[in-house]
Amino acid sequence: MSNRVIIFDTTLRDGEQALAASLSVKEKLQIAMALERLGVDVMEVGFPVSSPGDFESVQTIARTIKNSRVCALSRALEKDIDAAAQALSVAEQFRIHTFISTSTIHVESKLKRSFEQVLEMAVGAVKYARRFTDDVEFSCEDAGRTPIDNLCRMVEAAIHAGARTINIPDTVGYTVPSEFGGIIQTLFNRVPNIDQAIISVHCHDDLGMSVANSITAVQHGARQIECTMNGIGERAGNCSLEEIAMILATRKNLLGVETGINAKEIHRTSNLVSQLCNMPIQSNKAIVGANAFTHSSGIHQDGMLKAQNTYEIMTPESIGLNRNNLNMTSRSGRHVIKHRMEEMGYSEQDFNLDALYEQFLHLADKKGQVFDYDLEALAFMEAQAAEDNFYQLQQLVVQSDSTEGVATATVRIDVGGEIKTEAATGNGPVDAAYNAIARATDRRIDIISYKLGAKGEGQNALGQVDITAVYHEQNFHGVGLATDVVEASARALVHVMNLTCRADKVADYKQNMHKNRELGGV
């Protein structure tokens, strides 16, 4: 048996079914090209018979993708197969994926047919699809709840009809690993022509078992896993591609199989899918979550500084990240503070570690996470100055033209004791507020992340805006709270402006410090 596991991505078909709004053809093509760079073997990109838009997107992707095999879904109906074949005909290599329900509840309640009739439809669909390509995949929908005798008969008949891949879906995420592995094992034991097809699995996450079930299936002989980027999909989602890829890579010593995935593209592809699908990734998501390579415990941080593999079983670089994060919080020890200062280029004679650590703990207790620029400010500025706000937003007035989409914002800001009033227009109220604040502070920043949330519940909830901005090639993080979203955005912007102002003062101090050294001063 081959030790190569085929990665069948269905982000653009099953994954898209979870979205509140459909992706455009251009967005689907962007994702398809990213999946090709990632190295997926097969990408299922739509259901052509379902709509003209889906047909167009499948055809566009089929015409563009060269290295991955492009696949389209069809029911066990000739009109579906015709549409799939027509949309895929421009591809260099393609697959038709046809399916029918096989569980008793689906056969009787949904299809309202006998199992024998369904078996006949399945065989007919596979034979018809083979007229267009020799790469036909057949799926037994709801295989996880299908009586095993019926499942064995269906699989044998589909292979005999010409299916090269047989997919065994846990459509409703019902099975547990021991049970699902037993199904795969039984198929290998009882289906006489099983060696003439690749066994595939397609697991859903309703009980949180999709990845575990897929791995168990591989251990029992499955050699294709159907999955989606970030695990998006119907209901609770699908088996997560990034988790599967990294499990098989990290535990190759146990599982003895490999994929063709270029793992260094995982982070970039995950972010693209998250942004285009408007589905944020939870921070604690395995592999691609913001906290996946972040360490906050002082004990863990100490271990990481001594040997990275004490608390990391894979490296952030392996998925395309630059490095891990040692979050500086009140749980961090002196060694972490010393390490961060040294990484920023300071020697021990530049700062008093004991005094700095005491100030750090005071700030961390108030603020939570402390960033590098906070640490520098504590080291080189008086504590009071490090926390002062040079810019203070006193008033914000916004007017919007609903017909033109242009907004005007007027701000009154205290700039180091001097009151400044500025007005500006923008593409919407937040953009206008930013332009007005930039005028008043005479500072320009590039916003690279904008997140809107809420603090509190019901009518008492406050809008919370978190932004990340770049200033002089350094990232700064601002937070704003207000009952109004635009005001919260403005406060977050002013917060960042204050941080950049403080950073400039620290830079001046450092420059003077270096000059004094060169002159032989203290």
Swiss-Prot record:
GO terms for cellular component: cytosol
Main location: cytoplasm
Recorded family membership: Belongs to the alpha-IPM synthase/homocitrate synthase family. LeuA type 1 subfamily.
Organism: Shewanella sp. (strain ANA-3)
Cofactor(s) needed for function: Mn(2+)
Its job: Catalyzes the condensation of the acetyl group of acetyl-CoA with 3-methyl-2-oxobutanoate (2-ketoisovalerate) to form 3-carboxy-3-hydroxy-4-methylpentanoate (2-isopropylmalate).
A GO biological-process term: L-leucine biosynthetic process
EC number, UniProt record: 2.3.3.13
Pfam families for the chain: HCS_D2 (PF22617), HMGL-like (PF00682), LeuA_dimer (PF08502)
UniProt catalytic activity: 3-methyl-2-oxobutanoate + acetyl-CoA + H2O = (2S)-2-isopropylmalate + CoA + H(+)
Biological or metabolic pathway of the protein: Amino-acid biosynthesis; L-leucine biosynthesis; L-leucine from 3-methyl-2-oxobutanoate: step 1/4
GO terms for MF: 2-isopropylmalate synthase activity; acetyl-CoA C-acetyltransferase activity; manganese ion binding
The encoding gene: leuA
Protein name: 2-isopropylmalate synthase
